[in-house]
Amino acid sequence: LVNKIAQAREINKAHTTFIDTILKHSHKGRIHADINQLRSDNGGTVTGRFSYSNPNLQQIPARNKDLGPRIRALFIPEKDHTWGCFDYSQQEPRLVVHYATLQNLYGVGDVSDSYNNDSNTDFHDIVAKMAGIPRLQAKTINLGLFYGMGKNKLQAELGVSKDKATELFRQYHNKVPFVKQLMDNVSSRAQDRGQIRTLLGRLCRFPLWEPNQFGIHKALPHEQALIEHGPGIKRAYTYKALNKL
């Protein structure tokens, strides 16, 4: 009974949130959604990340194996046209290795050499071998640190006990020191200058910066500083690629 209720709620949410909204904004069989590049009264993000409204196409479900394909099947390309799906391979890890190499941080040399010798290098696999931990755990820690995730949240993502998480972090930072060093440098820059400028010139200010020890009870500006450095640069390269297309 509980599963049936949960399933009914999921179907109702899909209908009211997605299907009704899509039909509402449909005009002659087409959807003309608003693409927000900057924050405004009509939507958008303060970081400059693309967002959609009327309807929000980024919320079209994908994980539900039954409802997802059915709702996404509503969208088809124009006649004689084909849709493409493009994605950079491990964008964040490549940027981390790039900037860690520029700063000559300890431990990044072997990873940088791997990228130079093989463009298909798997960063998470290399880090897993360096730290002596499973690849999935290495990937979770990598992405968590790139985005300024605190220890408690990382522990929850890893699904391990506090003691096990502490041991994993210790092992990771001892064997892969350049990731934490780079994140600390970004945090220090935001603290000293009160701002970070992205590759495309976007200025992100931190007037309420609260310095804290890395990864422990992080303040929101700390997370924002890391997001503006790595993912902010990632967005810049993605925008350039979109313009070329």
Can you say where each PLM-predicted feature lies in the sequence?
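Conserved catalytic core of nucleotide polymerization and phosphodiester-bond processing enzymes
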Residues: L1-L245
